[in-house]
Amino acid sequence: MNAKIYGNIPRSHRIVIVGGGAGGLELATRLGNSLGKRKIAEVILIDASLTHIWKPLLHEVASGTLNSSEDELNYFAHANKNNFEFFLGKMFEIDRHKKNILLEEIIADDGQILAPSRSIRFDTLVVAIGSTSNDFGTQGAKDQCIFLDCRSQADKFQKEFLSLYLKAQAQVLLDESNKAKQDDINIAIIGAGATGVELAAELKHAAHQFCKYGLKSIQPKNISISLIEASSRILPVLSEKVSNSAENELKKMGINVLKNCRVKRIDHEVIYFEDGRKIPANLKVWAAGIKAPDFLKDIAGLETNHLNQLVVRPTLQTTYDDYIFAMGDCACYIPEGASRAIPPRAQVANQQAIFLEKALKDHIEKKTLPIFIFKDKGSLISLSEHNSVGHILGGVNIEGYIARLMYVSLYRLHQVALHGMFKTSILILKDLLSKSSRPHLKMH
């Protein structure tokens, strides 16, 4: 038995995972069903939210094409089924000497305390708190833009998008002369990485759905969507061929693609560029760049980089503490011989969860830890319901229906990691059956 003995009371090794995103939740599930089930370790997952939704789906939540309440996963229920514990809380400090993390209280909208401030003991800590948007200090970005870092922000955008659309619809109905007016709604998305590109395509799809549901006074052509990128092409981390293919598809949809445009400042209705140009914008989304949360900077004396990410060794242990690991977007790992860190992508978090399941077993048994090796399986970008572009293992470029099927399969693989093949098959069947009965767009 691998339990530690304190007096006559046995205590198993306590693994605390902070952050229930794609990587953290998959790791907790794997460890719960291996170490937790066999009582070798006590596995605890901590998150500031009660539910999980796969982050790459947030652009669909924001557009209303995905109802977040139907695809969310409750942490308490999932923990109960998978042999780990879930604590509601938000970490703000680590006490390395006492091996405690400190949680701040969680307060409801009505001012009531949902979770008190407290400390949680750990033997091994895994930090998996993900990332937040990086506004680079741009004037007006925090106050005027919506970010898409979590479900609540995506839900907020969806409500504002729907409200803006309905208000414009009402104005047209009140004043017939407004029917000739173009660009009644101006949406600006700052940042043409994966999130920005996917959101732009999904919003244009949503505009067509509004018309199908009878809101015909505002045609899709009257909704101007501008995708703004500071570099010379969209999707700059992908190949030029994939970038060009995605741009052509976006332009076919009627989306304005603005490249080499650096945002200087943002106010309530206008975005100003450094070259003196400006564009109107009723609704603004900031999707340019990421960083780890600010509180992580130099936390507990650990090494962090300029993006607040915890610097880790090839074992994913932090550089200054063997008992603290980091994974996903909040970790910076530069493989030997590489010039830059591995990218902040869902497939990285998935591979790290698989790696850490074994590595943490070795860690508990005080064995030599393996080295994490990232295997890039390619990237896929969704261009709404029926199209995707990207490249797969070996650099093969794909697009169209085949790419779309592969894109959807990424989410299904995440579900398999959490629920297993049988339950995922049931979820797929449920989604197929409900497609014929539920609206294709959230209208509330």
Predicted region positions:
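Conserved N-terminal Rossmann-fold NAD(P)-binding element of oxidoreductases
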Residues: 18-19, 127, 190-191
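FAD-binding core/adjacent interface of flavoenzyme oxidoreductases
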Residues: 2-12, 84-186, 285
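FAD-site-proximal beta/loop scaffold in flavoenzymes
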Residues: 144-175, 269, 278-351
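Beta1-alpha1 glycine-rich phosphate/pyrophosphate-binding loop at the start
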Residues: 2-88, 92-93, 194-237, 285
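Short glycine-rich anion-binding loops that position phosphate/pyrophosphate groups of nucleotides
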Residues: 23, 130-133, 200, 290-292
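A Rossmann-like FAD-binding core segment of flavoenzymes
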Residues: 82, 86-105, 204-314, 318-320
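C-terminal, flexible cofactor-proximal segment of oxidoreductases
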Residues: 10, 352-444
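Rossmann-like dinucleotide-binding core of oxidoreductases
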Residues: 177-238, 245, 256-258, 343-360, ...
